[in-house]
Curated annotation (Swiss-Prot):
Subunit field text: Component of the KEOPS complex that consists of Kae1, Bud32, Cgi121 and Pcc1; the whole complex dimerizes.
Sequence ranges assigned to domain Protein kinase in this UniProt record: 329-529
Reaction catalysed by this enzyme: L-seryl-[protein] + ATP = O-phospho-L-seryl-[protein] + ADP + H(+); L-threonyl-[protein] + ATP = O-phospho-L-threonyl-[protein] + ADP + H(+); L-threonylcarbamoyladenylate + adenosine(37) in tRNA = N(6)-L-threonylcarbamoyladenosine(37) in tRNA + AMP + H(+)
Family, per entry: In the N-terminal section; belongs to the KAE1 / TsaD family. In the C-terminal section; belongs to the protein kinase superfamily. Tyr protein kinase family. BUD32 subfamily.
Protein name per Swiss-Prot or TrEMBL: Probable bifunctional tRNA threonylcarbamoyladenosine biosynthesis protein
Length: 529
């Protein structure tokens, strides 16, 4: 089967042609604004002007005619609406003229599937980093699930916006990478990891302020990369332990960055897992990836009429079935974690846990020390305040800043994730009460997921090391957002589970509606907004 794929979600229009065993041809054209960033209408004009030529050249390279094509795939979303419409119109035209079937493809799905094809990865956790996208994705129960993502802007957009303010034309990423290689001074930038999610707007604001005050652009670029990339690798490693996967795959334009690739490779080596880096020519948006995803969808039984191919600028990967993937058996990581090592000890005859903050070689050493110490101190402080607020949580027995460790009460029971996977839901009412108590006390957890909640006869909240006292509504909303997404990531009937928990939360916290409205606002900020 010969498949033609058309990609056109943002700045690049591309045509790729494949069959089951060969990549036959690829032709692309990128819109490059003379000044500023991407202007959606101008990008669409560029695509409409060159798309015929791009398709013709790809057919010439493949040494076939348009009538030899058996299937047409196109990027349905997410993306810039004007660009998406140009691409979809071309795909529909080819389908109607040739009488061949057409399939609309989710753009991130294409990145994953071409990465799996060219690297040999089987069931990886994918770090997908580009201009508008920053996501950590894994396959769970028949679909790819978003385990973590940006809460504001994509990392590529952040880098490009800084570059633009510094007088560097689009795309600014490659030049920032070169400048960073000459930097030596690590500047203080916000390190914003919230559970499995990240935020980059604070880094952009601080970096622009450094630029205004005359700091060397080499040092600013170096600091942007060291800080932002460390955030990405941290959440990627956390996703491994949550999902039980033992492979990593990188894709997207930012995945071309050598420093990021080195950091991911180092993390994978320390964790004892395999890392796969998508070939450089297929990291950027391209038609081959759309053709590959369309091929897999078609072979799994997906069919679409032309009327069903409307574009969707907010199309999420977790809306798409992916039955061609068989989830690999879960890797047992034991008591290892992304940030700490857990040891079972005895404290004056009491069963206890000693949590040691471990160094991460992929991070800048100064940044690593700062993060480890701040989180350890924060966990100690917030655990005490949770107890004062009546929230079930471990009692802290000892705090040793010299060994970067905390010793605390051992809580018997199982993680909430394990209980939900076995169908237990009788604890959800109490969970809502505990979260309400925490938020009433002005405390945000910062990493409230199904793996930081222990269930026995009661519900216990653990590991608030990323938390915040004197929390604002936005901080509390991130707690609910993170918990909802971690429940959805299990692939269960998440609506019922979340609904039970939120009903109890609402009944016990007078600001719950404000928090939940902010959760909705956070979700609306995703991708190209």
């Amino acid at each position: 089967m010969i498949v033609l794929g058309l990609e056109g979600t943002a700045h690049t229009i591309s045509c790729g042609i494949i069959d089951e065993s060969r990549i036959l041809a690829m032709e692309s054209s990128m819109y490059r604004p003379k000044t500023g960033g991407i202007r959606p209408l101008d990008a669409a004009v560029h695509h409409s002007e060159v798309i015929d030529t791009v398709i013709s050249r790809a057919l010439e390279k493949a040494k076939i005619s348009i009538h030899d094509i058996d299937l047409i795939g196109f990027s349905m979303g997410p993306g810039l609406a004007p660009s998406l419409r140009v691409t979809a119109t071309a795909a529909r035209t080819i389908s109607v003229l040739t009488g061949k079937p057409i399939i609309g493809v989710n753009h991130p799905l294409g990145h994953i599937e071409i990465g799996r094809r060219v690297t040999g990865a089987i069931d990886p956790v994918m770090l997908y980093v580009s201009g508008g996208n920053t996501q950590v994705i894994a396959h769970v129960n028949g679909r790819y699930r978003v385990l973590g993502e940006t809460l504001d802007i994509g990392i590529g957009n952040m880098i490009d916006k800084f570059a633009r303010e510094a007088g560097i034309p689009f795309p600014g990423g490659p030049e920032i990478e070169k400048l960073a290689m000459k930097g030596t001074k690590l500047l203080d930038l916000p390190y914003s990891v919230k559970g499995m999610d990240t935020a980059f707007s604070g880094i952009l604001t601080a970096a622009l302020q450094y630029l205004k005050t005359g700091q060397a652009i080499e040092d600013i670029s170096y600091s942007i990369q060291e800080t932002a990339f460390a955030m990405l690798v941290e959440v990627l490693e956390r996703a491994l332990y949550v999902s039980g996967k033992d492979e990593i795959l990188m894709a997207g334009g930012v995945a071309l960055n050598r420093r990021l690739r080195d950091m991911v490779t180092n993390m994978a080596r320390e964790a004892g897992i395999r890392s796969y880096l998508t070939d450089r020519e297929y990291c950027m948006d391209n038609g081959i990836m759309i053709a590959q995803a369309a091929l897999l969808m078609y072979k799994s039984g997906v069919r679409m009429s032309v009327e069903e191919t409307a574009v969707n600028p907010r199309f999420r990967i977790d809306e798409v079935d992916a039955p061609w993937i068989t989830d690999a058996s879960r890797k047992d990581y034991g008591k290892a974690g992304a940030e700490s090592r857990i040891e079972e000890v005895s404290f004056h005859g009491r069963p206890a846990i000693r949590k040691v903050r471990i160094s991460k070689s992929y991070r800048n050493s100064d940044l690593d020390k700062k993060i480890r110490y701040e989180r350890m101190r924060n966990e100690f402080t917030i655990l005490r305040k949770l107890k004062e607020a009546g929230v079930n949580s471990p009692v802290v027995y000892d705090f040793d800043p010299f060994s970067m460790s905390i010793t605390m009460q051992k809580i018997p029971g199982r993680m909430m994730s394990a209980e939900l996977n076995e169908g237990r839901t009788d604890f959800l009412n109490e969970l809502g009460i505990m979260i309400a108590k925490m938020h009433r006390a002005g405390i945000a957890h910062g990493d409230l997921t199904v793996n930081n909640i222990i269930v026995n006869d009661s519900v216990f909240i653990i590991d608030p090391s990323m938390g915040k006292v004197n929390a604002e509504i936005e901080d509390m909303a991130v707690d609910i957002y993170a918990l909802e997404d971690s429940i959805k990531g299990l692939g269960l009937d998440s609506g019922s589970v979340i609904g039970q928990m939120l009903k109890s939360y609402r009944n016990n916290f007078n600001l719950a509606d404000d928090v939940l409205e902010t959760v909705s606002a956070i979700r609306r900020r995703h991708r190209y907004v």
